Amino acid sequence: MKKTLMVAALTGVFATAAHAQSSVTLYGLIDAGITYTNNNVAVAGGDGHSNWKATSGSVNGSRWGLRGAEDLGGGLKAIFTLENGFNIMNGTNGQGGREFGRQAFVGLSSTQFGAVTLGRQYDSVVDFIGPLALTGTQYGGTQFAHPFDNDNLDNTFRVNNSIKYTSANYAGFKLGAMYGFSNEAGGFADNRAYSIGASYNYGPLNIAGAYMQLNNVGSPTNNVNGAVTTDNTPFSAGRQRIFGGGINYAFGPATVGFVFTQTMLDDATSLNNVATNAGNINLGDSHVRFTNYEVNGRYNLTPALSIAGAYTYTDSRIAGEKPKFHQVSLQTAYALSKRTDVYLQGEYQHMTDDDNLPIGATINGVGMSSSSNQVSATVGVRHRF
């Protein structure tokens, strides 16, 4: 159960007018596990070795946050969210060491018209397509992401300096749009971001689509105070475009889904999140494309026991080569209570046509393999509060 704290009980940290009804909710999730990987490299191009490691956030990133609302009357509220990501194994902050790296925003919300918020926020691809892919849910998460999280469905990056609109639900339809400012005088388009998305829900059916574009993220002309910073994004490129859509349909305790996304990068200079001591992988100022197809499903065997799985095929173009990625991912989870569960999940990834590239199979979150194949398995526990 989430713990709702009255603002007055926070000893002056949060103040409120006597006539307004206000609240602050403290919430969080801790995900800790042990992960085995059959092949990891310390340096790109180096020898691969099996690896056992203690992990944080193998499924869902560990986090704690504060969510607040003040009733302004007439269906209007002032709202805010401050959310910190952290590594439970060593206590450090995630998202480049930011205090509130996962989310930090404030705004106004109307039951009739929707919400407008400003701050560090998720984009429309994450908001609308993410919940339809297993990487965007509790049924797969980090390690189920598409190669290098190229479409950001696993929230590798957030958008700074952003203003965001999310509509109310109109007979099952929802719309959203976001713009992230570059904050640079004379360089309005230098490291800016914008996105738009929509969804429709009717009973067991859920359909969504979205588009996002980033300009000059991590490029030689990058504005480091702009919308997306290099330490959080998978790629450095002159322009990155992501679009796609998905569909889910529920049959009683079962849900099946399909997701399509495509990521295109112009003037791509490096791949940033492969977790090797050699640092970033040089992409040679090339055109890069990833086209992802995911088929997924989940089933509640009992109220406490669930199983889930996904197959992802990714057709890509990287530095003139045409590697293809196949990944099969499976998870089972058992709820010990409403807030605590244990899980076991595994992934197998096979990469083809990679002979002339300095990369191998790379299951998201576990690091690169020295070969075209990689297997990973994690046993873990999650606690929500």
Where are these regions (language model features)?
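Gram-negative bacterial Sec-dependent N-terminal signal peptides
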Residues: 1-21
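Outer-membrane beta-barrel architecture
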Residues: 9, 13, 65-67, 105-108, ...
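Outer membrane beta-barrel
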Residues: 22-36, 52-182, 190-192, 199-210, ...
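Residue-level detector of the transmembrane beta-barrel scaffold of outer-membrane proteins
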Residues: 25-27, 77-79, 115-117, 174-176, ...
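Sequence/structural signature of outer-membrane beta-barrel proteins
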Residues: 35-41, 87-91, 179-186, 191-192, ...
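Residues that define the transmembrane beta-barrel architecture of outer-membrane proteins
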Residues: 48-62, 99-102, 157-161, 190-194, ...
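Detector for outer-membrane/organellar transmembrane beta-barrel domains
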Residues: 197-327
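Outer-membrane beta-barrel "beta-signal"
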Residues: 336, 371-385
